[in-house]
Amino acid sequence: MSHVTPAYLKQYHEELMKSFNIKYKNEDTGYFTISQPEKASPDAWGCSTLDVKGASWLIDNISLQDITGADGTTITIGDGSLYTGRAKEGRFHKKLKTNGTPFLLSETDSCASLTYEEMAVMANTGNFSNEMIAFFKKAVARDMLRIGFNGKMIAENTNPEQYKNGEDINIGWHALAKTFNKGSQVISDAFALGKGGDFADVHDLADCLITSKIPEGQREEPGLVVMVGAQLAARERLKLFNMADQPLTLTAGDMLGSSVAGRFAFIPPFMPGKRLAVTTLKNLQILTLKHSQRYRAEDIPQRGVYEHGYLREEGYALGDGYLYAASDENAVTLV
């Protein structure tokens, strides 16, 4: 069954194209789309990318990178240790250290559609056009974080009903850390957290991760943060920053009032509730193959829907595997 494209949808699509600085053209068929021309030059590809910057505080503070290869190893230069001194004989010297983790990009597709009937209701509300694209950007940004914290594998056909947090879409940061250096950076053996347990509280656990797993030269890194699972924070009634998925700016005062083990701490969206991790936000990387991005906004009369889609080659990496330390959610027993 084919539907007639509503007039309000044509108006919305025209406004959307203007926001992408693309000349509007209503085809005779009534079908229209924003997508990448087949023979476009690389310089024109920007019109079909989706910029998620500004969608949330966390997405703005991690590392989003366009790269030129679909696989490889990230390289981080230096380890935060001392590189200055003197030698009685000749010049002082010290070898520069490099660290990194392997990465593999895979095809990743995001999609959100509305029926004509749903859009008719929404079109009567103010600022509908801006809200529609803002929602899709935020949805993609949230999914990028969701996969980063929960991803465990790359399935040929994903199952969102079984893996509601994208566990089968890509290999996220925590899963990468569990295989890095034979798992040295993640506590995977069973332990008890609470009074009389192996660790008295979250502060004690975070301090152990910092002092035993983060290299000595990086323990005082100003950007080091503690990410606390919601279940751990609730158990100890910690009042931590928990709006990392919102587009806002934190002040020094905000950060001072949200701390664990003397470091800024927050509750990340979608991170498993009993996990605790210490790292710098820039160490959390989302990599996209340059020129692989394809954003589309499409009217599909055959199904009576208007659809937003974003296709790209994407993957996750840790800039420095040693700069990530965590306790696995399956290892902890709360006592």
Give each language-model segment a name:
Residues 1-48, 53, 58, 168-193, ...:
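Sequence/fold signature of self-assembling virion shell proteins
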Residues 4-7, 63-87, 142, 146-154, ...:
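Signature of extracytoplasmic/envelope-associated structural regions
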Residues 30-113, 166, 170-172:
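Assembly/oligomerization interface modules of large self-assembling protein complexes
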Residues 116-205:
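Alpha-helical scaffold segments that mediate packing/assembly in large oligomeric complexes
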Residues 153-157, 223-232:
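A glycine-rich phosphate-binding loop feature that marks nucleotide/adenosyl-phosphate handling sites
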Residues 202-214:
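Phosphate-interacting basic helix/loop segments used at nucleotide- and nucleic-acid interfaces
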Residues 207, 217, 224-226:
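Amphipathic interfacial helices
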Residues 214-219, 257:
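Short, conserved, surface-exposed binding loops centered on an aromatic residue
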